[in-house]
């Protein structure tokens, strides 16, 4: 529940304009087309030199945009307003001239008295920020010589002009700013994403409150001016830092936050992210700290380059002595892991950088360069990275394995990348390191998670009472359907639907009793429990198709073409991995191969001693994994038949067929 100081609607409503006014701006119109004679004629006739167009562009703005010195002189002589601003962005003529890198216009406007520290709104950029983007060093020099702060900060992210120039690879202005004393190690601010999420929610609430007042609760459509007033009301939440109290979910449904903040980037980090090698060189030569980490997730320039597939930039940073072992403080990603992951980026909810395709250096070259520089081949992840995350599925990875505890070798195995695995073993990587097992409560199936959520919802009396009668009936019957037939017989469905509130408690008690009984049942795999932090998924599981039996989108992760059998053969014959090794859910490699219908790999594993009779912790045989183990996976009859022939039992529990 959100508790905030309520705002008065009047403060927002008074901002609404009473009506649109047709703007006449003949001088600005003529200036836009560069018609100097028409401008002179209009001014002689008494036209207003400062009458702006609808977007706020005045004649002086257009002179600055065009770089027309003759036009500018006429306008200045006629009394043109130096600080006139556009309606959107509040750009002054000096901002426009600086953005275009027109040094003559900038000099003239400064001579005329233009404010060199004027700010755009809401971004709060100075003319120097925009000059840095222009790439024109002379423009930058004139502004600084006139008194502009070389390390000024814009309002939104507190970025300096040097950050602007570095991020866009404006080498000339980068060098000029550095010569003029710009600090190459100043970072932008970091944003607390959790706090921002709370403020976003409050801003939306305020906007809706204002719109509701304007539209009489939806009876008519708001005008653009009214919408603007609602937006302004929402912005107040950010400026005030509204106090927000969240309703937190049960601890049983909490998971580690995978990204807490963003930002905090230096000019070097920006240049590394974009792969601007020349800018990187210039920054380092001027004292940029090569291993300075960003404020968002503790990423170095080398790691930033590797994550984004900027392998040429990574090579340059290594030549300058970047430390290959500084991992992200957020999730433990190392440059070595990032190099493998960049080559085999999964298709997640986040757009994945494709710059690796245009690099002179390949990922294997960068991996070897990192190892030669002393990279630890066994650096382990401390948290699954946020950019390998899906949404809209029964689990947060949507079928991708949880990379917590993974090494670069496990990541290469998951990509069925024999070349990367062989390179890593050459440099001493331990192929037997597995990912870390999560807490036992987080190993539930999707169905188990859904049921637990439904039971918890039924147990919340306040939320239940807020439901409609039909929703209450659905909530109770959903749990009732999973009860034993002997119990259901004494609780007729029609009675429950007629009076769900009266049956809520008794159905809930039966469900909890049943869950307690199920929890005491022995593990069908016969395996000892794996504690939290123990071994979860090993390289041989990753290379044989772990997770494919779940049928989520993430199971279609990118990997080397036709790499399943070669990868497993490498792990068994060259590394010596056990074909019967179980993952934390009790599956062996035959289970995973069966879920994909990979008969060739199944036969190889059996030839090497693989146990087709193994049963998982969920009671699934190897044949079951090929027989529609979940409703999203179609049965593969040929694989079922093969496994039965090899000795696997078949539970005949095709969930797809039901």
Tell where the protein language model's regions lie, with residue ranges.
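Ankyrin repeat A-helix N-terminal signature
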Residues: 29-33, 62-68, 96-102, 130-136, ...
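Ankyrin repeat structural motif
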Residues: 35-43, 68-76, 102-110, 136-144, ...
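Long intrinsically disordered, low-complexity regions that are acidic and Ser/Thr-rich
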Residues: 206-249, 450-525
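Leucine-rich solenoid repeat scaffolds
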Residues: 612-653
């Amino acid at each position: 529940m959100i508790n905030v100081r309520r705002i008065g609607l009047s403060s927002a409503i008074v901002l609404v304009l009473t009506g649109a006014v047709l703007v006449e701006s003949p001088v600005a119109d003529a200036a836009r087309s560069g018609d100097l004679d028409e401008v002179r004629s209009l001014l002689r006739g008494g036209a207003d030199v400062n009458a702006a167009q609808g977007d706020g562009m005045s004649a002086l703005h257009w002179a600055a945009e065009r770089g027309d010195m003759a036009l500018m002189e006429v306008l200045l002589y006629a009394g043109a307003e130096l600080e006139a601003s556009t309606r959107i962005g509040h750009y002054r003529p000096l901002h426009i001239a600086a953005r275009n890198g027109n040094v003559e216009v900038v000099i003239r406007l400064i001579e005329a008295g233009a404010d060199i520290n004027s700010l755009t709104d809401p971004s709060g950029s100075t003319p120097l920020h925009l000059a840095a983007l222009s790439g024109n060093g002379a423009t930058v020099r004139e502004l600084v010589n006139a008194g502009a702060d070389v390390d000024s900060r814009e309002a939104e992210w507190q970025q300096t002009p040097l950050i602007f120039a570095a991020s866009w690879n404006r080498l000339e202005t980068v060098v000029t700013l550095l010569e003029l004393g710009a600090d190459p190690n100043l970072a932008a601010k970091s944003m607390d994403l959790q706090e921002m999420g709370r403020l976003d929610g409050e801003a939306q609430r305020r906007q809706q409150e204002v719109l509701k007042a304007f539209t009489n609760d939806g009876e008519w459509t708001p005008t653009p001016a009214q919408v603007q007033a609602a937006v302004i009301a929402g912005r107040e939440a950010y400026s005030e830092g509204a106090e927000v109290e969240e309703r937190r979910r049960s601890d049983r449904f909490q998971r580690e936050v995978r990204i807490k903040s963003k930002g905090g980037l230096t000019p070097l980090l920006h240049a590394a992210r974009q792969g601007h090698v020349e800018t990187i060189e210039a920054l380092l030569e001027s004292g940029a700290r090569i291993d300075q980490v960003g404020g968002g997730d503790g990423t170095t320039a080398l790691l930033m380059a590797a994550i984004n597939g900027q392998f040429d930039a990574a090579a340059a940073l290594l030549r300058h002595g970047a430390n290959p072992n500084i991992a992200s403080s957020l999730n433990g990603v190392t440059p070595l892991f990032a190099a493998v992951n960049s080559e085999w980026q999964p298709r997640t909810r986040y757009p994945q950088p494709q710059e690796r395709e245009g690099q002179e250096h390949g990922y294997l070259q960068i991996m070897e360069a990192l190892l030669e520089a002393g990279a630890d081949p066994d650096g382990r992840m401390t948290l699954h990275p946020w950019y390998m995350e899906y949404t809209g599925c029964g689990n947060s990875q949507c079928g991708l394995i949880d990379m917590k505890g993974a090494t670069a070798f496990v990541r290469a195995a998951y990509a069925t990348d024999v070349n990367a695995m062989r390179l890593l073993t050459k440099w001493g990587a331990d192929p037997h390191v597995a990912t870390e097992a999560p807490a036992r409560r987080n190993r539930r199936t999707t169905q188990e998670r859904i049921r637990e959520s439904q039971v918890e919802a039924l147990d919340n009396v306040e939320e239940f009472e807020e439901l409609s009668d039909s929703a209450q009936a659905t909530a109770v019957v959903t749990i009732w359907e999973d009860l034993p037939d002997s119990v259901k017989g004494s609780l007729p469905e029609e009675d429950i639907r007629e009076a769900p509130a009266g049956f809520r408690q008794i159905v809930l008690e039966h469900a909890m009793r049943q869950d307690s009984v199920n929890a005491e049942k022995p593990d069908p795999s016969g395996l000892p429990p794996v504690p939290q932090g123990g071994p979860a998924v090993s390289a041989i599981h990753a290379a044989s198709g772990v997770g494919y039996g779940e049928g989520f989108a993430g199971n279609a992760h990118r990997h080397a073409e036709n790499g399943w059998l070669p990868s497993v053969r490498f792990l068994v014959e060259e590394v010596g991995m056990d074909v019967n090794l179980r993952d934390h859910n009790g599956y062996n490699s035959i289970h995973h191969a069966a879920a994909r219908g990979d008969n060739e790999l199944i036969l190889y594993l059996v030839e090497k001693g693989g146990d087709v009779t193994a049963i998982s912790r969920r009671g699934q045989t190897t044949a079951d994994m090929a027989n529609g183990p979940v409703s999203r996976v179609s049965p593969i009859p040929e694989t079922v038949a093969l496994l039965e022939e090899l000795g696997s039992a078949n539970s005949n529990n095709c969930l797809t067929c039901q």
